[in-house]
A protein has these predicted regions:
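Terminal amphipathic alpha-helical/low-complexity segments used for targeting or macromolecular assembly
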Residues: 1-18, 121-176
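Short beta->alpha connector loops
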Residues: 8, 30-39
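Short N-terminal helix-initiation segments at or just after the protein's N-terminus
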Residues: 16-29, 60, 174
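Left-handed beta-helix
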Residues: 23, 28-29, 34, 44-45, ...
């Protein structure tokens, strides 16, 4: 009941209606998965939808002019991260091993192993290049374990200062 009051969707109810969701699915706050046509949506294994992502399977813009709403199958592959505030439009297929950058509007298919950003989303590099760039940024003093996250109940000033210092020195830090 509390989730409903916050405007959160009941994932179990969507699955009962026909939404297909793989293992390891993470749906953060404010995510909207098209409730009126969820059976047209398939989400693979190890997918994260960051806050306020919308996944659509219908387009009602045709209703006024044609008397019918356009619907299409929307598919998200395995090992996909969709950044905050992104919108995935009906009929799109996002391949495996893909990152969609925050705020992107996915209007066309995204191939396997891609990084896509923008409005409309376009592929800007391969997953391989993205991972190599980030590996190069990882140094012994800017990579931290779970102790340096809020999942650690004793996270405090010392951990916060270490993270801030690493970001100041390298421009970025990495946490588990």
């Amino acid at each position: 009941m509390l989730a409903w009051l916050r405007g959160e969707q009941d994932l179990a109810k969507l699955v009962k209606r026909g939404l297909v969701v793989g293992k390891g699915f993470v749906k953060m706050g404010g995510v909207i998965i098209d409730p009126s046509h969820c059976w047209h949506i398939t989400i693979g294994d190890n997918v994260t939808l960051a806050p306020n992502v919308h996944v659509l399977a219908h387009d009602a813009s045709t209703k006024v002019f044609l008397g019918h709403t356009r619907v299409a199958n929307t598919k998200i592959g395995n090992n996909v991260f969709v950044g905050a505030g992104s919108i995935i439009l009906p009929g799109v297929t996002i391949g495996n091993n893909v990152v969609v950058g925050a705020g992107s509007v996915v209007t066309k298919d995204i191939p396997d192993g891609s990084i896509a950003i923008g409005n409309p989303a376009r592929v800007v590099k391969s997953m391989e290049a993205f991972l190599e760039e980030n590996r190069q940024l990882m140094k012994p003093d800017n990579v931290f374990d779970e102790q340096f996250t809020l999942r650690n109940s004793s996270f405090g000033e010392k951990e916060r200062e270490a993270l801030l210092a690493a970001c100041e020195k390298y421009g970025v830090a990495f946490v588990k």
